[in-house]
């Protein structure tokens, strides 16, 4: 709703674009499941890729409308909650405000690093990471029990975006026998035929090489009498 704000044709509507929460609604919220305020994939700063874009009307239009909407509501502080993308948006909005003339409405911005990926630099852990490891490792242990009972193998994929923290945390706690994270895609696991894009050589996983490694693991375990 904030990105579509227009003071004349698209003002902010309570109950549709924003919600005023009372102390009663907040009571006991800390230990409840889910996200009472919902989630969003909006990114008003997606067109800002260079510093000069902050003052470009075509590039900063969405960001400007978001700032104007917050100002219209009298919001003086914003707490952003999320991962890397949310952090970038919060930072872009803060930098945009630095470009505003003196006396313009300013919103103080605080970012809370909540992501299961644990891929932030500068801090040891993000909250949400350990919860995700705990929940997913229990599922992995259930699969391990099934694998032993049925003499089977399971392949499990977890999230993690650009880092293997979550995968390794789940693998260790869930007693997996093999783990491949993004940091492990080196050497023989790299698909050399991928080529380059815009002068950048992306790193892709070679699935054939990965299959060879999985087969090697299976054969090694079978030699030890473990067919799971």
Regions of interest found by a model, annotated:
Residues 25, 33, 116, 121, ...:
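Glycine-rich, flexible loop/turn motifs
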Residues 34-37, 109-111, 155, 179:
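Conserved beta-strand scaffold positions in the cores of enzyme catalytic domains, especially
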Residues 45-49, 118-120, 189-191:
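Short acidic/His/Gly/Ser-rich catalytic and metal-binding motifs that mark active-site loops
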